[in-house]
């Protein structure tokens, strides 16, 4: 989202690869000095030290990302790299659901065809544009609801969708051409700004600055 203009601030590094390349990518990261490690979602040490049972809290946090962790592989950056201390998630596309239309053609034509529609292409890196990224997030929500019912990962995906709606002015019709009916019907996002919708304390403008009638 950051490359599209959404001020994400901080977060983990996430790379999506085709399923058939997933194990090869894992090995290449290991060969480059990356250490396979479970996701580190602990709160700051000054918070953890005051918890009566920090491990129980940590386990409860991870429970909300159970489906993500089951499909993905996480690594620690090696100390020699600028992002030392950060983590990277390697995600198979069967989980991410990024559209792969026009990507199975020769590389000299791939960037020309994929860039205007779905991706910005830099060498062998494909940065998803708005439609591809929203489709990926929405499919993630739909599949998460089907498999686990409710999760922190689902809430995070919805938050990302909301940020794209606000900062990039992505509209409900961005999914109209999606072949997956459940994804195409997803929408009706609320643009009101409040921590508690329905409390009567919503701001008089939506997240785009438009007056709410």
What residue spans do the PLM features occupy?
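Catalytic cores of NTP-dependent nucleotidyl/adenyl transfer enzymes across multiple folds
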Residues: 51, 56-213
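Generic structural motif recognizing short loop/turn segments at the entrances and edges of beta-strands
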Residues: 11-13, 32, 46, 71, ...
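Active-site nucleotide-donor binding segment shared across nucleotidyl transfer reactions
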Residues: 1-13, 17-26, 213
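Metal-dependent nucleotidyltransferase catalytic core
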Residues: 17-62
């Amino acid at each position: 989202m950051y490359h599209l203009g959404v001020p994400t601030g901080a977060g983990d590094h996430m790379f999506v690869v085709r399923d058939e390349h997933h194990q090869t990518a894992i090995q290449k990261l290991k060969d480059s000095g990356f250490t396979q490690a479970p996701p580190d979602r602990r709160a700051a040490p000054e918070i953890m030290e005051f918890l009566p049972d920090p491990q129980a809290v940590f386990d409860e946090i991870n429970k909300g990302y159970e489906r993500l962790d089951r499909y993905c592989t996480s690594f620690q950056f090696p100390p020699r790299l600028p992002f030392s201390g950060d983590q990277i998630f390697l995600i198979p596309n069967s989980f991410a659901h990024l559209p792969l239309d026009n990507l199975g053609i020769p590389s000299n034509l791939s960037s020309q065809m994929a860039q205007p529609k779905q991706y910005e292409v830099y060498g062998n890196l494909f940065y998803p544009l708005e439609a591809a990224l929203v489709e990926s997030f929405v499919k993630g929500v739909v599949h998460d609801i089907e498999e686990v019912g409710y999760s922190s990962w689902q809430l995070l995906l919805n938050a990302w969708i909301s940020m794209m709606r606000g900062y990039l002015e992505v509209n409900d019709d961005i999914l109209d051409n999606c072949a997956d009916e459940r994804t195409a019907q997803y929408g009706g996002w609320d643009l009101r700004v409040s921590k508690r919708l329905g409390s009567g304390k919503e701001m008089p403008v939506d997240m785009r600055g438009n007056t709410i009638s």
